[in-house]
Curated annotation (Swiss-Prot):
One of its GO terms (biological process) is queuosine biosynthetic process. This is 7-cyano-7-deazaguanine synthase. Its cofactor is Zn(2+). Keywords: ATP-binding, Ligase, Metal-binding, Nucleotide-binding, Queuosine biosynthesis, Zinc. Pathway: Purine metabolism; 7-cyano-7-deazaguanine biosynthesis.
Length: 223
């Protein structure tokens, strides 16, 4: 395994783009892997391809559309209206069951073919929106499972695991890509690039984080 290269699970959204540039800072060569999983807004994959090109990163998209057929959710089913608020007794219907499990398992197989043991993902327990497959315990458990399954020494990196959205924007600024991430990524559940629709849960979380970070930055610059 090549310990100086890394594979980034890359959607073209705020978090994974931040992780892409974080990986470029920490590893010699970086590869980006995107997934077509039946999402309504598949244009995110094309935007991911463009961003990867600007970053000088080798890009690959894999079709795993079966994931979208396994369970009902509002990201893949056009007949389901998206939850704007997380239900008190269940996951929000933007949760795609098994998505990160499949993504990271497939990424590990692909990384093995590339001779890579470092895999980077943008999951965060701080801003995990109630998704169980964004938790640190899940990542650590899967890391062990993948190593046992393939007799390898994979390392799953989660640079955003313990930081909130404001701190994620701060990291993007530190990496010199705040403007790129603000204007060129697609985080919006309604498929609107950049600042997004402003109404869906992803846009609200992203906007609140940006506003908080810009306030902190402005206060710091006054000192």
């Amino acid at each position: 395994m090549n310990k100086s290269d890394a594979l980034v699970v890359f959607s073209g959204g705020q978090d994974s783009t931040t992780c892409l540039f974080w990986a470029k800072k920490h590893f010699r060569k970086v590869y980006a892997l995107s997934f077509i999983y039946g999402q309504k807004h598949v244009k995110e994959v094309e935007l991911a391809r463009v961003i990867a090109g600007k970053a000088g990163v080798e890009f690959k998209a894999m079709d795993v559309s079966f994931i979208g057929n396994l369970g009902k959710n509002s990201l893949t089913d056009t007949t389901i209206t998206m939850d704007e608020v997380k239900p008190a007794d269940s996951f929000p219907n933007t949760f795609v069951p098994g998505r990160n499990l499949f993504f990271l398992s497939i990424a590990a197989v692909y990384a093995r073919e590339l001779g890579i043991n470092h895999i980077v993902t943008g999951v965060s327990q701080t801003d995990f929106s109630g998704y169980p497959d964004c938790r640190d315990a899940f990542i650590k458990s899967l890391n062990v499972t993948l190593n046992l399954a393939m007799d390898e020494q994979f390392v799953l990196h989660t640079p955003l695991m313990w930081i909130d959205k404001a701190e994620t924007w701060a990291l993007a600024d530190e990496l010199g890509v705040l403007d790129l991430i603000r204007h060129e990524t697609l985080t919006c559940y309604n498929g609107v690039q950049g600042d997004g629709c402003g109404h869906c849960p992803a846009c609200k979380l992203r906007r609140e984080g940006l506003e908080k970070y810009l306030e902190i930055k402005a206060e710091r610059e006054k000192r």
